[in-house]
Amino acid sequence: MTNIRKTHPLMKIINSSFIDLPAPSNISSWWNFGSLLGICLIIQILTGLFLAMHYTSDTMTAFSSVTHICRDVNYGWLIRYLHANGASMFFICLFLHVGRGLYYGSYMFSETWNIGVLLLFAVMATAFMGYVLPWGQMSFWGATVITNLLSAIPYIGSDLVQWIWGGFSVDKATLTRFFAFHFILPFVIAALAGVHLLFLHETGSNNPSGLSSDADKIPFHPYYTIKDILGVLILILVLTCLVLFSPDLLGDPDNYTPANPLNTPPHIKPEWYFLFAYAILRSIPNKLGGVLALVLSILILAFIPLLHTSKQRSMMFRPFSQCLFWILVADLLTLTWIGGQPVEHPFIIIGQLASILYFLLLLVIMPITSLFENNLLKW
């Protein structure tokens, strides 16, 4: 009798994706982040579901409903902080996952990569709308500033902003629709993640060498299931420490003040994971230019496969490209720091230089260096 996992219509999908899947024998821990992102998504959907049971999306009661969750609901504080810090863990895993893809040339699987870029946009949109829901000062002003950026679009801009707001300012209609979208988008993300995996399993995984691993495959289970469990345990340990010891480490104190349209906070800034893009936005004095740069800072990832000029796929054997990659990482960390600083000297000029370097590295310096490396190897 054939094993049920190979014959049952549902089981055989799971079997071919997580059990008998042929995987390269040399993939490192950098390949763990896909499963970690899956775990993060599950944590976010579950904690979010329980929060939604107690949350009210009304401007008069939103802030107090979050307070009620933390004070009166059994383990409500735990659920709330798991959800808030779970988002931070989600983005840490996302950035490392994208960084791995850039370093090892995984973007050559263009369908998988482009679905990934789409996923990144969807997660960013979800996180932004989630940040508005507690209806604190930074929620309100963050929503006002970011949605207002759309008014830079010629001709339709101001109508578009009013259409998103559902009125002439960020108010009850905005909060209600943001809650609705924040609830539905994670399920869209889950579906997209399924498509992401579908395209990945068409080609099989990349590996650190960037060479074909068809000659040397091992089954996903037990080798990579055990390896993934280690990653999951580390993720849960870090998240638990964050939630139990310093739940507000990555948050903004301004969000503990109820939203007040008459009082602007001295420094409006988004959550830490958007600061790099926010710094790029602020570094351009023109509103439309800033918005375009903001969108391009993420959208540029979609053009990475077209900018690949090297004869080798991975950066494993390309020391010059490796140096540039780590300069890019340092540049992004600099942008993240600048995004959280006030708009004054010397932060303005540092932000502008870091923004220019970011685009120069990805669009010009790295492709030219790849050609130079080809030349060195007489390829």
UniProtKB/Swiss-Prot annotation:
Keyword Transport: yes
CDD domains referenced in this protein's UniProt entry, alphabetically: cytochrome_b_C, Cytochrome_b_N
Cofactors required: heme b
Coiled coil location: none
Main localization category: mitochondrion
Function comment: Component of the ubiquinol-cytochrome c reductase complex (complex III or cytochrome b-c1 complex) that is part of the mitochondrial respiratory chain. The b-c1 complex mediates electron transfer from ubiquinol to cytochrome c. Contributes to the generation of a proton gradient across the mitochondrial membrane that is then used for ATP synthesis.
Entry protein name: Cytochrome b
Lineage: Eukaryota, Metazoa, Chordata, Craniata, Vertebrata
